């Protein structure tokens, strides 16, 4: 197992000039840097970038690879070759020859042998618990790469919006910690090169799709991260960003085509109104602004409707899935693209990996809108996103409000009841990703004003909800933040840096409150990991009464009763009302305390507490 990736180095294209003149290196960049035999789609795109390439005659010396077409754009410095790989093609290197008159340049390109069973790889499911982290803010395992010559930003931990030095090596060193916590899947925000002049730490403004940012590590380190995950029983999710690149991307100085990005006479942002896609009365102007406006001034809006860019980006993610043995995808800002093009884009990747699941960021505020984006939903317009999962921003809003409110018809615990009552709109409510917070919104600790009782209620409701949970790094220690401030959502994990005064990755390095939260979450995660009833079990809920909300998760072998008391006082619950679920059962054990409860008559529930009772 330790040598799994020795056969998968990222081989860069060799450019060999077969002439004496120094100026004959017409081709300066070839992407992707390698490809594979035995892919489902036999044809792949090869982008050549250099100087006046369109005047060159191009041939290939290979028995198993042929040029199926050559596509030119309005920029003479680019040529797009579509190469067809025969089904019986043998892996190895072959020559691509460019000729201008008597002068030639030879590119040595490599086809690798595809990993056996690659297309059948398994993905994350409703059985998983996902841990989201920002690499720059999690742990610094290699201080030597903190600042790199030629990159605008180095490390300044005292500046919230600067780079802080976390890296892939730091993540690798903490994989056993995540496995012990009960995490089964890791999602990192992007790792691609990002040489922006400010806020480059978030990595969402890519400068080079085939290069891991050297301040995070080397390309080979990403492979090591994947191996570490798999050796410890974790899956790995890649963050897919088809909507935009970074203004520092190498092609921004010489765009492959005029319509490679969406442009305006002056800078124009998106209107960010994703509701326009489901609005039956939406104007064309609003939809155009949504999809063609830029997400931010430093994030040029990619024109995914350009077929050359479409194929280029598709191959980027296939390349990394294949190279680093990735298990799943999360798609950033999905509705900011023309959604039918985005759907084809995701489908084209899943054609290579039929079992791969994909969760989409579709930041809308009603269940009907969220459901529209889950694959399999019977939409009136027949739209299918090809997203097997969606992020439940509606449930996130309930978590942020319910425990701070007094009970009313539509406040407090009634929020949970009313939201779950709308699950009929989903094609598959068990494949929805639930979360308390993430890197784009306020920390959950802020929402509940650092009240440990409320925080634990949120964790309990999250880990027992239909769908599957996503935990944001630091949630296990109730990490603090600053409301309404992106940088305030992304504090460093204490102990991730050698110079930190304490190490919250350890029991001794945590406060009493932090250990209480950590131990509680770990108990819930481990229980969920080992009990399918909380992964795929059916759900039944009862209308909240007197500030107490009860629901059940159940399957053929086990029943779990979840009792949430949102009152500031201890309450007594008469369980006779729930006889359809507990008839014939006499007792149950609360999974976080191991306390036994009689189911004969009354149960006392402490104030601001969720009991999770396994019925015997």
What are these regions (language model features)?
Residues 1-26:
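Bacterial Sec-dependent N-terminal signal peptides
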Residues 21, 92, 105, 112-129, ...:
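Carbohydrate-interacting/catalytic domains
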Residues 22-54, 107, 111-116, 120:
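Beta-strand/beta-sandwich contexts
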Residues 39-102:
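Immunoglobulin-like IPT/TIG beta-sandwich domains and homologous Ig-like subdomains
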Residues 122-127, 179-181, 187, 229-231, ...:
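Extracellular/periplasmic catalytic domains that process cell-envelope and extracellular macromolecules
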Residues 129-131, 186-188, 236-238, 329, ...:
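Hydrophobic faces of well-ordered beta-strands that scaffold small-molecule active sites
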Residues 138-184, 188-318, 323, 342-352, ...:
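Substrate-binding/active-site clefts of carbohydrate-active enzymes
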Residues 226, 244, 316, 322, ...:
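Active-site-proximal helices and loops of the catalytic beta/alpha 8
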